[in-house]
Amino acid sequence: QAFVANFERPRDPHPERTTWSQEWYDKFKDLEIPVSKGYVKPIADPITVTSEFGWRTSPITGAQEFHNGIDLVNGNPNTPIFASADGEVIVAGDANYFDWYGNWTVIKHADGMYTGYAHQSRVDVSKGQKVTASQQIGLMGTTGPSTGEHLHFQFMDEFYPSSAAHFHNARDYISF
């Protein structure tokens, strides 16, 4: 009995702390914390996301499909596309590799991740080339099955993934 009594404390010994904490929480709860994993945006702001990562109705076929990337536009024609991190180009402009991507670039990064940049109107790098973060790698376009000029941007933990589980949401790496 005496042992239990030593651990009994008032439920809220400092109610002012709870009020203060709640006020700060309410003030900042909607603040978007930027994701920082060493990656930068692949196109310049202002960026509009036109199709999110995940299940969607295909704008081409009308069927349900898993969209393995994120579609980005910024309203400017011939928008430059930049490498999101340092790495080595493993695919450059090979429209026949995966015909639904049109002209595209894939970069392997030091952390083992791969980034893909699809539907490019122009590819400015070549296979085997080393690139640095923010280096221009091409121009946004609408090659391959596409409903308009945009960048299909994707993260993968292997090339080329055997299942959807190996694709990652770009928003987990970069704040858009």
Model-predicted segments: where are they?
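Non-catalytic cell-wall polysaccharide-engagement segments
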Residues: 1-44, 163-176
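Peptidoglycan-targeting cell-wall enzymes and recognition modules
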Residues: 1-9, 73, 113, 122
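Acidic, glycine-rich catalytic/binding loops that coordinate metals and/or anionic ligands
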Residues: 35-39, 48, 76, 126-135, ...
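Short coil-to-beta-strand transition motifs
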Residues: 38-46, 79-86
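Short glycine/threonine/proline-enriched tight-turn/helix- or strand-capping micro-motif at secondary-structure
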Residues: 50-83
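Zn2+-dependent peptidoglycan hydrolase active-site motif and core
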Residues: 64-68, 83-124, 146-157
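Short, well-structured beta-strand-loop connectors
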Residues: 80-92, 125-140
